[in-house]
Amino acid sequence: MPRFIEGKLDATGLRFGIIVSRFNSFIGERLLEGALDALVRHGGDDGDIDVVRVPGAFEIPLTAQKLVQKGNYDAVICLGAVIRGSTPHFDYVAAEVSKGIAHVSLATGVPVVFGVLTTDTIEQAIERAGTKAGNKGFDAAVTAIETARLYRELR
């Protein structure tokens, strides 16, 4: 009979770093509210959560690396919104942010969760920041909790 290993959705005693981009802050702040709600709702303590604000999404990966190096975080949650405009800038930023976040997680073994919206329109971003499509900040925090617990089980 196989043994199944999975993380529990319990943030009690876990420490989290949250990085949120100030660019498109009206979206980022809704994502942050969702993430904080999820962490506290699942047993997290406000005193175990550090929120770091960065200018834009491009600064998120290096900041995540700095947080992980600082230590004592069970997971880092990355939040922001990159919205397509009329130039290729979106493609460069979205690609590098997603690659950078994945790299930090793989290089450090600490869950660094991608909660950065990459949308074609502002309407799509609004839908994913607490309206029709739920709150992706909440979802990212749930992923962080479960993954942090899973990694503790795998030690």
UniProtKB/Swiss-Prot annotation:
Single GO MF annotation: 6,7-dimethyl-8-ribityllumazine synthase activity
GO biological process, one term: riboflavin biosynthetic process
Pathway, per record: Cofactor biosynthesis; riboflavin biosynthesis; riboflavin from 2-hydroxy-3-oxobutyl phosphate and 5-amino-6-(D-ribitylamino)uracil: step 1/2
Keywords (A to Z) from UniProt: Riboflavin biosynthesis, Transferase
Catalytic activity annotation: (2S)-2-hydroxy-3-oxobutyl phosphate + 5-amino-6-(D-ribitylamino)uracil = 6,7-dimethyl-8-(1-D-ribityl)lumazine + phosphate + 2 H2O + H(+)
Binding site for (2S)-2-hydroxy-3-oxobutyl phosphate: S86, T87, R128
Binding-site positions, 5-amino-6-(D-ribitylamino)uracil: F23, A57, F58, E59, A81, V82, I83, F114
Active site: H89
Enzyme Commission identifier(s): 2.5.1.78
Domain of life the protein comes from: Bacteria
Main EC class the enzyme belongs to: transferase
Pfam families reported for this sequence: DMRL_synthase
Cited function: Catalyzes the formation of 6,7-dimethyl-8-ribityllumazine by condensation of 5-amino-6-(D-ribitylamino)uracil with 3,4-dihydroxy-2-butanone 4-phosphate. This is the penultimate step in the biosynthesis of riboflavin.
UniProt xrefs under HAMAP family: Lumazine_synth
Protein name as it appears in the record: 6,7-dimethyl-8-ribityllumazine synthase
Name of encoding gene: ribH
